Design a protein with these regions (language model features):
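N-terminal Rossmann/SDR dinucleotide-binding element
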Residues: 2-79, 201
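SDR active-site strand-loop-helix element
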Residues: 8, 80-83, 122-127, 180-185
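NAD(P)H-binding glycine-rich loop region in Rossmannoid oxidoreductase-like domains
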Residues: 61-102, 133
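Residue-level signal for the nucleotide or nucleotide-sugar donor/cofactor binding architecture
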Residues: 62, 94, 102, 152, ...
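Catalytic helix-loop patch of NAD(P)-dependent Rossmann-fold dehydrogenases
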Residues: 94-101, 105-112, 121, 130-184, ...
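Alpha-helical substrate-binding/gating segment
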Residues: 187-188, 210-228, 236-265
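Conserved small/polar residues in nucleotide/adenosyl-binding loops
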Residues: 276-283
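Hydrophobic alpha-helical segments, chiefly the membrane-spanning helices
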Residues: 287-289
Length: 289
């Protein structure tokens, strides 16, 4: 019998690619998304790639009753991959309470419902932001690296949510978790049926570059040119989104394994440095060619 996985934020960039990989690995998928930063048409792309249209429920996870109704409708859910969150760093500085409400309340609702509906494990989408700005001599960052004070409310919600999960499990809750701290996902599925298609202004480099190259945006502005790097711009560790999606599938298989630890942490990246200006130039050159 196929295992059923709930993917929150499943019509988003990483969520949609993870849904594809889950279905191709033999899982049933139920997507929950409020469509605040994604499009329902993403389901069409997933179906074209896999031949399977995942179950979909448009739900705001802050609404506990609506969230519980999902578990009642799909009682065979065994695991959760939790992507759903507000994620624009700049906006989080302008609207901190919105970010604390969206990102923290939704997780608490899921955690409270998991034991009631015998959901075994949750994969939490965390971020390298918990490490702050490590010094060059401390790169690449390991899971044992000390956490630093978050530079934005968005980053702070990731740190807080990690602690909430740990505290809940350590209190004796009958669930398990794997926290994935990943770096900078880029790219799109090779079929080109799904990719990074945010509503409004993109928050990440690659969709901004592609929209500028297509004439949707007038220009690309890169902030910061005095970093101690070869091109003066900040460094990033870019990871291909399909590889990241496969990491989530592996994590789900692991968290459902009875022999693993109650909570584990893994960084997901390449360990390879990229410079923002050079990456933008390379992407644009490939588009033009």
């Amino acid at each position: 019998m196929k295992q059923t996985i709930l993917v929150t934020g499943g019509t988003g960039f990483i969520g949609s690619h993870t849904t594809v990989e889950l279905q191709q690995a033999g899982y049933n998928v139920v997507i929950v998304d409020d469509l605040s930063n994604s499009k329902i048409e993403v389901l069409d792309g997933i179906e074209k790639i896999t031949g399977i249209r995942p179950a979909f429920e448009q739900v705001d996870l802050r609404d506990k009753a609506a969230t519980e109704a999902v578990f009642q409708k799909y009682p065979d859910i065994e695991g959760i991959i939790h992507f759903a969150a507000s994620k624009a760093v700049g906006e989080s500085v302008q609207k901190p309470l919105l970010y604390y409400r969206n990102n923290i309340v939704s997780l608490i609702n899921l955690l409270e419902l998991m034991p009631k509906y015998q959901v075994k494990g949750i994969i939490f989408s965390s971020s390298c932001t918990v490490y702050g700005q490590p010094k060059p001599e401390n790169l690449p960052v390991t899971e044992e690296a000390p956490h630093q004070k978050a530079t934005s409310p968005y980053g702070n919600t990731k740190e807080i949510n990690e602690q909430i999960i740990a505290d809940y499990i350590h209190s004796g809750a009958a669930i398990k978790s794997i926290v994935l701290r990943y770096f900078n996902p880029i790219g799109a599925h090779p079929s080109a049926e799904i990719g990074e298609l945010p509503n409004g202004v993109p928050n990440n480099l690659i969709p901004y570059v592609t929209q500028t190259a297509m004439g949707i945006r007038k220009e690309l502005t890169i902030f910061g040119n005095d970093y101690d790097t070869p091109d003066g711009t900040c460094i990033r560790d870019y990871i291909y989104v399909v590889d990241l999606a496969k990491a989530h599938v592996a994590a789900m298989a692991r968290v459902l394994d009875k022999e693993t630890e109650p909570i584990e942490y893994f960084n997901i990246g390449t360990g390879t440095v990229s410079y923002t200006h050079l990456r933008a130039h390379a992407t644009r050159s490939n588009l033009v060619c």
